[in-house]
């Protein structure tokens, strides 16, 4: 489901992290 992706995206937006700069640990 997109629960994990949703949480990760929320954290990225809050922290201002970019997938390129900080790849999420899958």
Swiss-Prot record:
Superkingdom, taxonomy of origin: Eukaryota
Compartments it resides in: Postsynaptic cell membrane; Cell membrane
One GO location term (cellular component): postsynaptic membrane
GO BP terms: monoatomic ion transmembrane transport
Keywords: Cell membrane, Ion channel, Ion transport, Ligand-gated ion channel, Membrane, Postsynaptic cell membrane, Receptor, Synapse, Transmembrane, Transport
Topology class, membrane: Multi-pass membrane protein
Catalytic activity: K(+)(in) = K(+)(out); Na(+)(in) = Na(+)(out)
Family, as annotated: Belongs to the ligand-gated ion channel (TC 1.A.9) family. Acetylcholine receptor (TC 1.A.9.1) subfamily.
Record's function text: After binding acetylcholine, the AChR responds by an extensive change in conformation that affects all subunits and leads to opening of an ion-conducting channel across the plasma membrane.
Subunit record text: Pentamer of two alpha chains, and one each of the beta, delta, and gamma chains.
The protein's name in its UniProt record: Acetylcholine receptor subunit delta
